[in-house]
């Protein structure tokens, strides 16, 4: 009887929750317009219904979201990804072209339709096409829930970013070029916050603010602090944490921090809100680049605005690895599936610099990977059908997955996993090449003890020449991207694909393609069945698939050996010739030159007469040359 009453109570609660859930419908059309975001240069930006910036979305847990996204740009495809949302049962809504959907062609409309059942906190959305979010196609996505454990009076969101004066498409042409063989990333012109510079935040005294801080940039990590104010971290990447007080945050692109800031009682003074480039990520620092950006926390509008606030060190920022989740989840046990990848940046045979996981640079297939899953039947668990250059791994249902990432590069990289918040169980220190240190890969037999209750998040950075280890449970069937969130590196191919429980995807009604999906694919002429090469007859035949450029051959090719042989032979002959002529009497040498080269003696004599005086005047120290000319005249 008790169990029956409990079941009825749970059912009634579920029905009540459904009744309270709302549906939020948005009709958005992309376009182009000019904006002067940083006050220095007007440039094209991607607009939403003719407006800029794009709107933030705020919903409650359990709500349904419907976004009709129409591509109003006539010169490019587009898409939309909801960063950090798990998309349980709706992997086709994850918004990654050629992974979970077809690109949205000019004039086409795609419906993103999903329920936010498993996420709360701070997220964001952005285009997942050709770096478009650096041109402004992005906004925050906030999911509220009554169960949030901390009290506050008011809240504010801050979107941090770098800003370029040029379009990403123009920057990409010079970045992905033989004239940029080292892969040096384009340098931004400024740091901005909430799509402007010198933001003013008016505050009330003795008030607790919930501050949502999101780095929506595509390249540079930022240091963030507020002059003479502490920040209490209470959430990262949608995961509520135990309180942790800090003076400074280090925020990579795509990461989110939610903090509590309590204001002072005294209103006589205003304070600086500071952003600073992580300038170690810049290959060069232009002389006119301002590494700091200052906004204003204003208590008193009649008081002077603050100047820049300088700190003694930027090394004392919060290390997110040691944060404790509010709802503790014990570390997963020994993994069932270990994926080890090495990060390398290198050039291919076309002379362009690319990024690699284990010597594979991600190259999009001809059929979106999710559609290959849905159309491949009992071969869906064969990773080969997804393409040679998609770097696809098959994950079985509910297995514990460990990703070991070894960074062979000298830069910092923030990595994002779609569809999951992972446990962060290891992150090693920086190994500085300037000090002669070499890349250090994870050693499973020699590492610090793993945390009992690891921090969870969806975006984690790896330090230079270092490593990290993450774990998650494969309990969310779908096709999920794991990639560097530096947009330049994603354009270079730094990504891999996880096909999680492929047969579970096939069996779920909610995972099937909608008519709208198929219409979008038809509009851009992308196949919706078959393997990575769009072959529907033999899924193991990848003839015609998209592949990366060839590697530069190691050592010498046959042509190189032949060229080197003839070069050496020519060089040896040259040395012998110089030696022979050098040992001969000058008069005999002159005779030999005339005889061997079939020179007309009178022509040579005329040349000697005309140039003798000029040669002597230009080089009085060339005694041997003067003697040669004199002997030549005597000879004739």
Swiss-Prot record:
Describe the location of the Plastocyanin-like domain by residue ranges.
Answer: 32-146, 157-301, 362-502
Positions contributing to Cu cation 1 binding? 81, 416
Q: What induces it?
A: By iron deprivation. Repressed by iron excess.
Taking the first listed entry, what is the main subcellular location of this protein, grouped into a coarse class? membrane
One GO BP: reductive iron assimilation
**Cross-referenced InterPro entries, in alphabetical order?**
Cu-oxidase-like_N, Cu-oxidase_2nd, Cu-oxidase_C, Cu-oxidase_fam, Cu_oxidase_CS, Cu_oxidase_Cu_BS, Cupredoxin, CuRO_2_Fet3-like
Q: Which cofactor does it need?
A: Cu cation
Question: Which keywords describe this protein according to UniProt?
Answer: Cell membrane, Copper, Glycoprotein, Ion transport, Iron, Iron transport, Membrane, Metal-binding, Oxidoreductase, Repeat, Signal, Transmembrane, Transmembrane helix, Transport
Transmembrane feature ranges = 560-584
The family database entries (Gene3D superfamilies) matched by this protein are listed as: Cupredoxins - blue copper proteins
Q: How does it sit in the membrane?
A: Single-pass type I membrane protein
Q: How is the cofactor bound?
A: Binds 4 Cu cations per monomer.
Describe the reaction catalysed, as an equation.
4 Cu(+) + O2 + 4 H(+) = 4 Cu(2+) + 2 H2O
Q: Which residues are glycosylated?
A: 27, 74, 77, 88, 113, 194, 198, 244, 265, 292, 300, 359, 381
Q: Which residues bind Cu cation 2?
A: 83, 126, 485
Sites where the protein binds Cu cation 4: 413, 484, 489
The main enzyme category here is oxidoreductase
The UniProt function text for this chain reads: Iron transport multicopper ferroxidase required for Fe(2+) ion high affinity uptake. Required to oxidize Fe(2+) to Fe(3+), which is then transported into the cell via the ferric iron permease FTR1. Essential component of copper-dependent iron transport. Also has cuprous oxidase activity.
What name does UniProt use for this protein?
A: Iron transport multicopper oxidase FET3
């Amino acid at each position: 009887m008790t169990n029956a009453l409990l079941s009825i109570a749970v059912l009634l609660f579920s029905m009540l929750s459904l009744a309270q859930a709302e549906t939020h419908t948005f009709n958005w059309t992309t376009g182009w317009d000019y904006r002067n975001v940083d006050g220095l240069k007007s440039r094209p930006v991607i607009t939403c219904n003719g407006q800029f910036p794009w709107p933030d979305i705020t919903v409650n847990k359990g709500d349904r979201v419907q976004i009709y996204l129409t591509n109003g740009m006539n010169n490019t495809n587009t898409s939309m990804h909801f960063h950090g949302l798990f998309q349980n049962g709706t992997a086709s809504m994850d918004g990654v072209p050629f992974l979970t959907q077809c690109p949205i062609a000019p004039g086409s409309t795609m419906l993103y339709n999903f329920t936010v059942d498993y996420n709360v906190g701070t997220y964001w959305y952005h285009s997942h096409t050709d770096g478009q979010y650096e041109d402004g196609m992005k906004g925050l996505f906030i999911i509220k829930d009554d169960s949030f454990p901390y009290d506050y009076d008011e809240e504010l969101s801050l979107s941090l970013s770098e800003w370029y004066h040029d379009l990403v498409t123009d920057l990409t042409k010079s970045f992905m070029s033989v004239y940029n063989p080292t892969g040096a990333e384009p340098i931004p012109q400024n740091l901005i916050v909430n799509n402007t510079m010198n933001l003013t935040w008016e505050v009330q005294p003795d008030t607790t603010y919930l501050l949502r801080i999101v780095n929506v940039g595509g390249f540079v990590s930022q240091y963030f602090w507020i002059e003479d104010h502490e920040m209490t971290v209470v959430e990262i990447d949608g995961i509520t944490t135990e309180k942790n007080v800090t003076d400074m945050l280090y925020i990579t692109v795509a990461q989110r921090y939610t903090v509590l800031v309590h204001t002072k009682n005294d209103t006589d003074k205003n304070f600086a809100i500071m952003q600073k480039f992580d300038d170690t990520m810049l290959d060069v620092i232009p002389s006119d680049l301002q590494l700091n950006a200052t906004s204003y926390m204003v208590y008193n509008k009649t008081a002077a605005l603050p100047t820049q606030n300088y700190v003694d060190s930027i090394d004392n920022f919060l290390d997110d690895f040691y944060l404790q989740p509010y709802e503790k989840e014990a570390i997963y046990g020994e993994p069932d599936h270990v994926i080890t990848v090495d990060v390398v940046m290198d050039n291919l045979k076309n002379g362009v610099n690319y990024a690699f996981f284990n010597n594979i640079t991600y190259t999009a297939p001809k059929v979106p990977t999710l559609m290959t899953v849905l159309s491949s039947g009992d071969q869906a668990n064969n990773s080969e059908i997804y393409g040679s250059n998609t770097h696809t791994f098959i994950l079985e249902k509910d297995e514990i997955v460990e990703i070991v990432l070894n960074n062979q590069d000298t830069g910092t990289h923030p990595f994002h996993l779609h569809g999951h918040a992972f446990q962060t169980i290891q992150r090693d220190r920086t190994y500085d090449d300037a000090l002669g240190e070499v890349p250090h890969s994870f050693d499973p037999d020699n590492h610090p003890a793993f945390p009992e209750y690891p921090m969870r998040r969806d975006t984690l950075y790896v330090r230079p020449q270092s490593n990290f280890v993450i774990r998650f449970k494969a309990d969310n069937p779908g096709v999920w991207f794991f990639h560097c969130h530096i947009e330049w590196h994603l354009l270079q191919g730094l990504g891999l694909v996880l096909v999680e429980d492929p047969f579970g995807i096939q069996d779920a009604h909610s995972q099937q393609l909608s008519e709208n999906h198929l219409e979008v694919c038809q509009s851009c002429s992308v196949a919706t069945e078959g393997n990575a090469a769009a072959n529907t007859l033999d899924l193991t035949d990848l003839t015609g698939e998209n592949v990366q450029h060839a590697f530069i051959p190691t050592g010498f090719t046959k042509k190189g050996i032949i060229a080197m042989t003839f070069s050496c032979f020519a060089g040896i002959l040259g040395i012998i010739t110089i030696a022979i002529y050098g040992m001969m009497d000058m008069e005999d040498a002159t005779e030999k030159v005339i005889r061997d080269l079939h020179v007309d003696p009178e022509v040579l004599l005329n040349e000697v007469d005309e140039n003798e005086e000029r040669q002597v005047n230009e080089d009085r120290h060339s005694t041997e040359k003067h003697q040669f000319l004199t002997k030549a005249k005597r000879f004739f």
